[in-house]
Amino acid sequence: MFHNSRKTIGVFLERSASEFQNRLCQGIITGAKEIGYNVAVFSDYGNYGQNHRYFIGDQTLWELPPYEELDGVVLALDTMEEIVSREHVIKNIRERCHCPIVSIRELLVGANNLLVDNSSCMEGLIDHFVKEHGMKKLCFMTGPKDHWDAQERLLCFKRKMDEYGLSYGEHQIFYGDFWKNKGKEACDWFLAEGEPQPEGIICANDYMATAVASELIRRGYRIPQDIAVSGYDGMRSTLSFTPCITTATVPFFEMGRRAVQIIDKKQDCPEKVENVFFDAVLQPRESCGCMASEGQEVMTIRQRMYETENIGQNREMQFHFMSIHMSECHTIDEVGQKIGRYIYNIEGFKDYCMCLCEGWLEKKEFKGFTDKMEMPIAIRNRENISPTRERFDRRELIPKCMSSEEPQMWFLASLHFQDLCFGYEALQFIDAETTGRLYMYWNIIIGNLLQDIMTYQKMQKLVVKLEEMYDRDALTGMYNRRGFENRGNPMFEQAKEEGKQIFLAIIDMDGMKQINDNYGHIEGDYALKKVREAIHHACP
C-alpha cells in the first residue's frame, strides 16, 4: 500500500477536524512516524441536515480501504452519529481485516480498547461540587443510553450521590447526544415548572456543557452565581468560552500514540487483546466558581480563537469566490488550472490528489469506486503538477508519483454529488499540528463542480446529437437540405478563399414511385439505402 514497503495503519472516524479527532490523529501520526508506519485516515462528514442521499454518497468512503492489506486499525466509533456507519465499518473490519484492532473510548469485543477511567475523575468532579462549593442539588446530563462512556459516567454520578445521601429525581438526569444539539432540551428538563432550581449541572462531555451554559446565559442565568456548570474531556474550546468551563482533561494525544504502540507490539498476535485505561485530570475553572489556574493559557487560547475566527472568515470568503470561479470550468483540466489558487486555504496541506473513478463522466447511478482510478489533478510539495492522467490500482490509494519511501500520512474523503460517487480526494499535511483540517465546504464545492462538468458535457453531446438529427436524413444518414445549407455554404466559402474547385452533384432517383406503389415502402427504403451506399462508395 502507498507504493512503499512500510506497514500501514487505517484510522476510521467522522469529522477529523473536530478537536478530539484532531488531537487523536496527531497522536497516531506522531506515534507512526516514530516507528516508521504509514497512516491512512478515512474520515467522512456525517449525516448533516438529514440529507439521506448525501449521506449515502458520503458512506461510499467505507468501501474504499483495502481492509485485507491493513496492518492495524484504529476505530473512533463514538464519533459516528449514525448506527449504519458504525455497523458498516465494523462489518468490513471483522470480515476482511487480519490485524490488531484498537477501539478508542468505546468498548468493542475482540479489540484492544483504550478507555477513559470514568470513575476516578467523575467522582472528583462531583466531590468538588459537593465539598468545595457545598452544592446538594445537582443535575447530570449524560450521553446516549447505549454509549459505554455515558453509562459509566451516569453510574458514577448515581453512586456518588448515594454516598453523600443526596437525592436525584427524574428531572435531575437527562440523556443528551455528546454534541451541541440538546442544550435547550436539557435546560427545559432540568428547569421544568415545579422542580427546584439546580445548584449545578454536571455534563458528561464538554460539547454538552458549552451547549447548556449557552442556553442558561440566553435565559438570563448567571454562571456560576445562579447555576454552576461542568463538562468532561478537556477540549480547548472550554478555555475560550466565557466563563471558562470546569472540566476533566483526557489525554487524547497519548491515546492515539499508545494505539500505534499496541498495534506494533501485536503484529504477531493480533488475537490477543487488552483494555487500557487512561486517567483524566480535574480542571476547576470559572464555571463552578473557581478561578482559572491557567490564566496565561486562557489568554493564549482566546487569542488563538480570535485569530482562528479571522482566518475562518477569510477562508469562508475564499471558498465563496472559489465556487464562483470554478463555475466557469467545463472540463476537468480547467479545474486543475484553478484549484491551486484556492487549496492553500486548507491549513498546512502538503500534497493533494483528486482520484476519480474510471468513466465517472458516464455515471448514471450510485456504484461506488472502480478498481482502477485516475488522478487528473495533483499538487506535490505544494506545487501544482496538474493536469495529469495517472492511472493506478485503487488498492494503493494514491499513484506512485505521489508517494515515497518516507512514512505516508494521508487523509481521504469521498467525492460525490448526493449519492453519486465520483471518486475521492487525498491530502497529506506538513506536520502533526496541522493534521486533519479537512473542510466539508471544500469537499461539497468540488463534488458539485464535478456534477456540473458531467451535466455540461452530457448536454454538449445531446446538442451534437440533436444537430445530427436535424441535419441528416433519418433513413440514410446523409445530410438533408438543412444539413446541406449548414455545411455546404462554409465549404463554398473555403473553396472560394483558397481558389480551389468544388464538385457538386444533384442525384435524382427515377422510378421511386413505381417501387413504392408496386412493392411497398419497405422496398422503397431499401432502394434509397442502396443509392446511399453507391454514393458513399464513389465518394468515401
What spans do the regions from the language model cover?
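Amphipathic HAMP/coiled-coil signal-transducing linker helices
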Residues: 37, 321-325, 460-481, 490-493
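Conserved nucleotide-binding and Mg2+-coordinating catalytic segments in signaling enzymes
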Residues: 467-486, 507-523, 529
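Helix-loop-beta substructure at the N-terminus of cytosolic sensory domains
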Residues: 328-369
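A short, aliphatic-rich beta-strand micro-motif
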Residues: 400, 406-416
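Bacterial carbohydrate/catabolite-sensing allosteric modules
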Residues: 1-321
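Short hydrophobic/glycine-rich mini-motifs in sensory/regulatory modules
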Residues: 415-425, 436
